[in-house]
């Protein structure tokens, strides 16, 4: 094994070559059951990293890991198609760490992620896998102090995990920072990156990094945009496809609940009460409803907490950690939380709002029934959502079953919910988070607070990097918001 360069040897541990270690002996908790009997050592992973896999509970490679790692170790570009929860992070991290171990240098690899939470999660897993070789990582995301991130960059990390917007800010504004020596580029959740309008920023990033590099692109689907990005950024890639169709696992019980739109909140309260022993995630389409419903549930005695892209980064991480640790059993979230995040032991997913496509549905309900465990999902379906429900059922190849409720019990909750809704609207107005009584008031609050009439929860890094918001036809005062 080659010796490290003088610059890196002082910061990256380099023990002598050990003997072959035994195969890891515990289970890989977040990847689906593999369809092979290979070990990480069989794939060519070094004993040091095999031990790291074992310490993290990875018994054997997942299918995406078994398919991608050998090609990556041969130095090939890879496009990997696999669903969330398939073990993609280790699939690209292990080959990078192994090559880094053999030739340590700063700014060795860059991983682009669509959301801040996913960026932190990737960094944590990379750090854990590379703990035995002293890997240094830095996370660059919006909502956090630029100066502290600049200090982290001055320590010359081996691997950077970033959202595209904040990375571009540092490339343009942080003195002495460049990626001219970069050896690896990873784009994780590429379809989500492009859905969030990061395409123009990624184009800029591709222009300032070396053309001679290894590139890994991982995506749940091969969309037209992803195919275009592949052609622009990868060189003769090997295509690794674990699943070509969106599907849900057999251990997930999928239900729908047909209800009138006007009573939606009462039905949600009924479910929260009847299933109160469950750890649950409630998905909303808008930031305002995530905030509003969490307030309503808290006022009625339920341990709920919101998670959406308009919260500060510290609040987002605090919400996520409280839910993961069991401090709160209900997380009311937008689609910021639907992909990639490792949230163990979610018993129930409730779709308060219908996802607009099958892809988002699969990602949402994929937060439960992970790693062979059972789980349940309930999708609230109003009279306006029936066609969307049928499309989703057709796409996933499964029929959902109707969830039975006591309609008389629901009716008894309407006055309680209406009062809590008024109190939530008042709290949101007083705290400056928008709101007003009823749907019209809530819509008005959303326009006032969240600005652009676009009710998708888009990560702030898009705006920070200068990409205009969709449907943003009017900005009060006509002034462009400065980057953070």
UniProtKB/Swiss-Prot annotation:
Residues 263-411 form the Helicase C-terminal domain. Coiled coil: none annotated. It catalyses: ATP + H2O = ADP + phosphate + H(+). Disulfide bonds: none annotated. Residues 439-448, 468-484 have a biased composition (Basic residues). Residues 1-14, 22-34 have a biased composition (Low complexity). Its EC number is 3.6.4.13. GO terms for molecular function: ATP binding; ATP hydrolysis activity; RNA binding; RNA helicase activity. Keywords: ATP-binding, Helicase, Hydrolase, Nucleotide-binding, Nucleus, Ribosome biogenesis, RNA-binding, rRNA processing. Residues 69-240 form the Helicase ATP-binding domain. ATP-dependent rRNA helicase required for pre-ribosomal RNA processing. Involved in the maturation of the 35S-pre-rRNA and to its cleavage to mature 18S rRNA. Interacts with the SSU processome. The Q motif is unique to and characteristic of the DEAD box family of RNA helicases and controls ATP binding and hydrolysis. This is ATP-dependent rRNA helicase RRP3. It comes from Cryptococcus neoformans var. neoformans serotype D (strain JEC21 / ATCC MYA-565) (Filobasidiella neoformans). The gene is RRP3.
């Amino acid at each position: 094994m080659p010796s490290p360069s003088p610059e890196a040897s002082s910061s990256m541990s380099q023990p002598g070559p050990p003997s072959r270690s035994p195969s890891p002996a515990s289970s890989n908790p977040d990847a689906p059951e593999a369809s092979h009997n290979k070990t990480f050592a069989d794939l060519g992973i070094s004993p040091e990293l095999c031990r790291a896999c074992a310490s993290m509970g990875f018994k054997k490679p997942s299918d995406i890991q078994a398919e991608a790692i050998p090609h990556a170790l041969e130095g090939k570009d890879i496009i990997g198609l696999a669903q969330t929860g398939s073990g993609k992070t280790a699939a690209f991290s292990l080959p990078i760490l192994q090559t880094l171990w053999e030739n340590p240098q700063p700014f060795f690899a860059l991983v682009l992620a669509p959301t801040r939470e996913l960026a932190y999660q990737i960094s944590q897993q990379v750090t854990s896998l590379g703990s035995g070789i002293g890997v240094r990582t830095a996370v660059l995301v919006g909502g956090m102090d630029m100066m502290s991130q600049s200090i982290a960059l001055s320590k010359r990390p081996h691997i950077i995990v970033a959202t595209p917007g904040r990375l571009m800010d540092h490339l343009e504004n942080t003195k002495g920072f460049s990626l001219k020596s970069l050896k690896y580029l990873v784009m994780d959740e590429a379809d989500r990156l492009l859905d969030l309008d990061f395409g123009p920023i990624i184009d800029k990033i591709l222009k300032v990094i070396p053309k001679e590099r290894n590139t890994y692109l991982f995506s749940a689907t091969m969309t037209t945009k992803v195919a275009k990005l592949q052609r622009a950024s990868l060189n003769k890639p090997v295509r690794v496809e674990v699943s070509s169709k969106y599907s849900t696992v057999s251990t997930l019980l999928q239900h729908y609940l047909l209800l009138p739109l006007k009573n939606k909140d009462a039905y949600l309260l009924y479910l929260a009460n009847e299933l109160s022993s469950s750890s649950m995630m409630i998905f909303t389409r808008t930031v305002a409803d995530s905030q509003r419903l969490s307030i309503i549930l808290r006022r009625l005695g339920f341990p709920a907490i919101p998670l959406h892209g308009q919260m500060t980064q510290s609040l987002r991480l605090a919400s996520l950690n409280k839910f993961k640790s069991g401090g709160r059993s209900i997380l009311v979230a937008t689609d910021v939380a639907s992909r990639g995040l490792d949230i163990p032991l979610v018993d129930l997913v409730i779709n308060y709002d219908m996802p607009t496509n099958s892809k988002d549905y699969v990602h949402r309900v994929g937060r439960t029934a992970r790693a062979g465990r059972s789980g349940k999902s309930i999708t609230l379906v109003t009279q306006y959502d029936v066609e969307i429900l049928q499309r989703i059922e057709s796409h996933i190849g499964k029929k959902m079953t109707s969830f039975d409720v006591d309609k008389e019990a629901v009716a008894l909750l309407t006055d309680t919910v209406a009062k809590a809704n008024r109190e939530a609207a008042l709290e949101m107005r007083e705290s400056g988070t928008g709101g007003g009584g009823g749907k019209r008031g809530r819509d008005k609050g959303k326009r006032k607070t969240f600005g652009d009439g676009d009710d998708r929860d888009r990560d702030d890094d898009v705006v920070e990097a200068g990409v205009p918001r969709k449907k943003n036809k009017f900005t009060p005062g006509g002034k462009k918001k400065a980057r953070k």
